[in-house]
């Protein structure tokens, strides 16, 4: 039987063993992190300060931006610090925290994107019932339900992963802890864990994806029935950013499972993990800022207010 000594720390992979490349990785990741953080903070500020954006759609957009800022903060700053300090170690407790938080934020973000699709569906297809179906009380209830179910979901997967013995190695082929990489280190049978991941991912991810697609089929069939003009343009301007955000999020997550044989597994893991941990939080505020007219107007108003107060 393999030696099943308790692993108290793990070793994460470097992007490079060359010191100058480690510095380059740290600097580039830190810049992307700052841009992402500022973009999401801007969305939160705009949707909070502008009273014209105090609507359910922007309530969920604000929550999504807070979530994105937290999500990228779980992995990227630690990776930057490790590169600067030339360190690859992470404690078992730190690894548990990373796994739990990554699973939690990904799960809740998927639910938020689904709720936002439902919000657009009701606004476009059932406008007369919108104030009743999507009111402030319902918004808060859906948010709390997403967060609480996320805690249960993340706790279930984190607990089932770390109850396994790790004895093959303590080297994780990622720049942060994630469940697929940890399962490869276990010396026990991980079949039940893998089945649970696949079933839950298909159940949650597949269910949300089908709901989002169904919502937008109804939305576009309704919008195309509008006469050409301001109403159709406004409907498209609020829906298209959300479709782009959903596409970036789902494509970045699904790309983790696409592994071309020409690229070594370790390199592939690092590239894909960097992609799905950075791209969705980075692009979400950019997409909403560029494609949503109300957001652009609100940003201009806040900028004018800031510059005016400075000049005074």
Swiss-Prot record:
It holds the Pfam family 7tm_4. It is a multi-pass membrane protein. Its main location: membrane. One of its GO terms (molecular function) is olfactory receptor activity. Glycans are attached at residue 3. The chain crosses the membrane at residues 24-44, 53-73, 98-118, 138-158, 195-215, 236-256, 270-290. Keywords: Cell membrane, Disulfide bond, G-protein coupled receptor, Glycoprotein, Membrane, Olfaction, Receptor, Sensory transduction, Transducer, Transmembrane, Transmembrane helix. Residues 45-52, 119-137, 216-235, 291-312 are cytoplasmic. It comes from the Eukaryota. Residues 1-23, 74-97, 159-194, 257-269 are extracellular. PROSITE patterns: G_PROTEIN_RECEP_F1_2. The keyword Transmembrane helix applies. InterPro entries: GPCR_Rhodpsn (IPR000276), GPCR_Rhodpsn_7TM (IPR017452), Olfact_rcpt (IPR000725), Olfactory_GPCR (IPR050516). It is found in: Cell membrane. Disulfide bonds join 95-187. The keyword Glycoprotein applies. GO terms for cellular component: plasma membrane. Belongs to the G-protein coupled receptor 1 family. Odorant receptor. This is Olfactory receptor 14C36.
